[in-house]
A protein has these predicted regions:
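Hydrophobic beta-strand scaffold residues
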Residues: 50, 75, 156-157, 214
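Short, conserved phosphate/pyrophosphate- and ester-handling motifs at nucleotide-, phospho-/glycolipid
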Residues: 43, 187, 249
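Conserved phosphate-binding/catalytic region of the ribokinase-like
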Residues: 1, 148-151, 200-292
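Active-site metal-binding loops of divalent metal-dependent hydrolases
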Residues: 6, 131, 251
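Glycine-rich phosphate/adenosyl-contacting loop at the front of the ribokinase-like
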Residues: 1-53, 62-63, 242
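Conserved beta-alpha-beta core of the PfkB/ribokinase-like small-molecule kinase fold
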Residues: 125-202, 221-223
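Structural alpha-helical scaffold elements that stabilize or flank donor/cofactor-binding regions
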Residues: 118-119, 174-177, 207
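Conserved N-terminal subdomain of the carbohydrate kinase-like
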Residues: 20-22, 45-128
Length: 292
């Protein structure tokens, strides 16, 4: 069970230098996005049984349901008659790195009444991103879902999602809310905000005080995998000709979770991280965050 943001992504990659105050040739693409929706799509595409809950504008609710269904996700989307679907304009640099301009729109209006009855009845895992903890209305939903998951004995997985949003909230509060989650997937910047360390191995080790499995994503430097009581393990990135890094971390998370959901406690964690790195490397070679 995944709950969180759904967005309309607009990807903009200038061709050559930017001409301030005038026209700049660019490659522009519109794609479905949203961190939680992307992660759900990759989990389902790679074999997991996934239900997703979120809120979108009524005008394109059918489009987003169809896009998620295309990857195998059972989409429970509330259609908001008064707000647009969240939108992100993503400026892609020549090296594939991104700068994002975000209007979360209908995502910010998600509420408990949008969750269908019995949504967690058949779930084994609840997966949330940090975006669901960033605003008071959403935080209420996130904390309620976490309480329900814990009372039912469900595992929880967390992707902190955004260093900028984490910096606006209290990192200590986020750690407290998500304490005991089975898996956490911060990137380097998010991990640094959460634990105040600069070294990725130290970040990962510190985070195992709160989570059972920690995977610190390092982009082209791969990732660090850590579990309590054992030295962190470095997993290298797969080489790739990067055109657009949008969704690479989401694909990594979804791929790792697909292996963990399939194999449970028997999961070969380094092999799962290596598989996730391979999937993420495929994503950066093209535009868009979802499976083709």
């Amino acid at each position: 069970m995944v709950c969180g943001d759904v967005n309309n992504d607009v990807l903009v990659k200038p061709v050559g230098g930017i001409n301030p105050g005038s026209d700049t040739p660019a490659v522009i693409r519109a794609c479905p996005g949203g961190a939680a929706a992307n992660q759900a799509a990759w989990m389902a595409h790679l074999g997991a049984v996934v239900t997703f809950a979120g809120r979108v504008g009524a005008r394109d609710a059918d489009y987003h349901r169809a896009e998620l269904a295309r990857t195998g996700v059972r989409a429970c989307l509330a259609a908001d008659p008064d707000a647009d679907t969240g939108s992100i304009v993503i400026m892609v640099a020549p090296d594939g790195e991104r700068t994002m301009f975000t209007d979360r729109a209908a995502n910010l209006r998600f509420q408990r009444s949008d969750l269908p009855a019995g949504l967690l009845d058949d779930a084994a895992v609840l997966h949330l991103t940090g975006y669901t903890f960033c605003e008071p209305p959403l935080l209420e939903v996130a904390l309620w879902l976490l309480d329900q998951a814990r009372s039912r004995g469900l595992a929880v997985s967390i992707d902190p999602g955004s260093a900028a949003f984490l910096a606006r909230m209290r990192p200590s509060a986020f750690l407290r809310w998500t304490e005991g989650a089975a898996v956490c997937f911060p990137n380097r910047d998010e991990a640094a905000i959460l634990v105040g360390e600069a070294d990725p191995d130290a970040m990962a080790a510190r985070l195992t005080r709160h989570y059972s499995i920690v995977v610190v994503k390092l982009g082209c430097a791969g990732c660090v995998l850590a579990v309590p009581g054992e030295p962190p393990v470095r997993i290298p990135a797969h080489p790739a000709d990067a055109h657009d890094s949008t969704g690479a971390g989401d694909a990594f998370c979804g791929a790792f979770m697909s292996r963990w959901l399939a194999d449970g406690p028997a999961t070969d964690l380094p092999a799962a991280a290596e598989f996730a790195a391979r999937i993420a490397a495929q994503v950066v070679t093209r535009f868009g965050a979802r499976p083709l």
